[in-house]
């Protein structure tokens, strides 16, 4: 029997309106037996105008189609080539509907027997990919795609990815492939037929040694860490000297001193606070101290960071470099809380649950493939979003471990003694519960970027009740006996009657009525919240595009909560004495929902700080109620300070006014800390100049146009004189976008790449910024820190405004109860810290040279200016107008040109 041929099709069109728009380019790549066997490509003439957006997206201009055929001239040829093939496309509905319409206009009835959507295929085959856009997939799998949104290249790329996916399926254990087949019957297209053929043609073989089996699940075996065999007879200085020499790094006595201080805290189980200026190489210092501690004592160290970026830098760059220099194995791994790791029993329960829901079906297939690949069992590898994430978290919350369960966190616990360095982040450090956490595994902890710890603690102490979440959780139960969990109860009652099961009768109608009453009570609860929002003073957050209400009477909400909790308690009593599996599943779901309401009710009764938020003022469905359950100081004391014998807090910005007292206030205990303010900086006054314009008017929020124009004028002067890259930091998205619009309109920036901060794209934007010689990056809060600005020439950082949090910020509201003076004790130190972090973006090594421009005149006229001025002590300072700025730039450019 001949193997099927796949016609992988991609179309470019004048738009996405099927009834109006037309095809302007077609690309087809033919695949048989996982090999590309041919291609077809043609531009297609149209009498429609090609919109500018489409021209920009596809790089197809109207004159490129002048000599191209109309579709009707090549329709017969295309039809002959794809007839009998499996029709394949990425997001197939678009391409299939357009080509069927175009064929129909040529009196050709095209109806492919089988259709496959590669968007569906790739979601299943590549469960850990962060994006399923074609360009992102190509990059992730090493396929070169030079011209995205050109039909011929997109079709070829899709075909190559399809082959990779098929080969992956064919390498899976047979039992896994069979399960994928049964699940794929619930998908939208014909992937099940393709998987069936793979099963039918599968070469019988025993299960590979790489795999093991738990119930019906085939999973990749975990390989234990081997005990490290480190042979090094020297002290820390010898270790530091060897590593710096082997890696070609500069020997820095102050960096060695920092490492020695950290080692001393570890050796004597001390608690310490260390400020080591930005660019001082502190991560290298604490890694070597941790390694030396392990060599001398056999004990291991936990290192906590605040970003995934820094985690990845430690695990993928810094630690491998040290391994290479020393030529011996270092066991270092990422460690999280227990709930972040998968239990195979949970996967088994998810697979057993009957559901025809499309997203749940995709998730089940993803889990089956992921568990054959993962070494860690880290659930975040799946990057679940939307409905899948809500479904999985609900299953995780209600999961009761089965007998002989295999939990991946136990792998970490089992190997703890052989892990020399554990890497975690602040969120996991604070979230972990004492009975199943990383605290059992490590006595010693180093917390890098410790100044960010309170922010993560604040997230941890805040509980949330959202309309969307509760609606989803109730939806899993269903509203009628033909839906979801209610259907399983109805089937159980029918089974009881027909098979005379020895269980009490189930009042399905009564249960259904109760469930609908709970739905109504939930609607009433959020209607009450909606009415409160509409009648209250509303504050806006432009960053997250949310609206907030802080001052309101919680009594009406408490009344509605009491009613819904009472109804849920009565419903739970309905299940008393029933132990059937289906009953347990429904009861667990009601318990989960009830606990969510009870936690919020208790906090409101205790008069904890709370606020309401709404994304769309006209949609009740976007409401969230947030309540602060604990003080940040309490959680940091109990969850961090009390849990480790040795604890070192380290940051480039840990002091305020040259004192650690502000950071000490985050802990409830009067405890002695060793404190060190270390001058390891490589910055000399000649490297950096801080320029403060005196010709920029004070910021006025009612009219910021003049302020924005002044900023742009200074940027123009900089790029005109220096012709190098520039980072501009904002505290407002509105101002950032105003500057962006002006820059994009001006001819002075034609040669520049202008990049703007985007959600979930920061890492990629930083890479792009660092790769261009002429680039301007506009960013807000996240770019004030944790960002390595690379440039061969003069570097420039412009700070539009001092980074004070808005007094309507939720953080301000939530933290108000913990301070006598919120501004002096919290807001001002936070702003100074962020300002110092912003300054630190500029000089990261002894070779860097640059200029900082701070436009906010509060830096020189406010009654708190001295706290910011202390941040500028190590820099040359100049005040002047734009002409003096230009003179300074010319001088810097001349000095930089003299560098060897």
Curated annotation (Swiss-Prot):
Domain called Helicase ATP-binding: residue spans: 241-496
EC number: 3.1.-.-
One annotated GO molecular function: ATP binding
Single GO biological process annotation from the record: DNA replication proofreading
Binding site for ATP: 276-283
Family affiliation: Belongs to the helicase family. DinG subfamily. Type 2 sub-subfamily.
Protein name stated in the entry: 3'-5' exonuclease DinG
Organism the protein comes from: Staphylococcus saprophyticus subsp. saprophyticus (strain ATCC 15305 / DSM 20229 / NCIMB 8711 / NCTC 7292 / S-41)
